[in-house]
């Protein structure tokens, strides 16, 4: 097989895998509700605003629990706050 053809096939495979990975990332994100328009009935607007409020709460909620990535895990281990060594606060340094 031609070396140039191998290079193009490898680039095509990498691009395909990149699109697959990006597709899986976007599937996990909630979709914004559709706006019914300005002349929609009050019931439709109430449903839309309720769905919009729910959407905003989903994308801005605090995430608690074991959702740490490897980077935050390493930084927590190196400079993290523990019971024996509490993290210093900026305000404590200005207590003069």
UniProtKB/Swiss-Prot annotation:
Name the Gene3D superfamilies on file: 6.10.250.900
Q: What is this protein called?
A: Pro-neuropeptide Y
Q: Which InterPro entries match?
A: Pancreatic_hormone-like (IPR001955), Pancreatic_hormone-like_CS (IPR020392)
GO biological process, any: positive regulation of circadian sleep/wake cycle, sleep
Instruction: Kindly state which keywords UniProt assigns to this record, in alphabetical order.
Output: Amidation, Cleavage on pair of basic residues, Neuropeptide, Secreted, Signal
Which family, according to UniProt?
Belongs to the NPY family.
Task: List localization entries.
Answer: Secreted
Q: Which residues carry this modification: Tyrosine amide?
A: 64
Cleaved signal peptide residues: 1-28
Q: Which GO terms describe its molecular function?
A: neuropeptide hormone activity; neuropeptide Y receptor binding; type 2 neuropeptide Y receptor binding
Function recorded in the entry:
NPY is implicated in the control of feeding and in secretion of gonadotrophin-release hormone.
Q: What is its main location?
A: secreted
A cellular-component GO term for this protein: extracellular space
């Amino acid at each position: 097989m031609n070396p140039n053809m191998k290079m193009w096939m490898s680039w095509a495979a990498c691009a395909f895998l990149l699109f697959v990975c990006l597709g899986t990332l976007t599937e996990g994100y909630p979709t914004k509700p559709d706006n019914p328009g300005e002349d929609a009935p009050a019931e439709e607007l109430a449903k839309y605003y309720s769905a919009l409020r729910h959407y905003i709460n989903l994308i801005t909620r605090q995430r608690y629990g074991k959702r740490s990535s490897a980077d935050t895990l390493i930084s927590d281990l190196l400079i993290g706050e523990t019971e024996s060594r509490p993290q210093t606060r900026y305000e404590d340094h200005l207590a003069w």
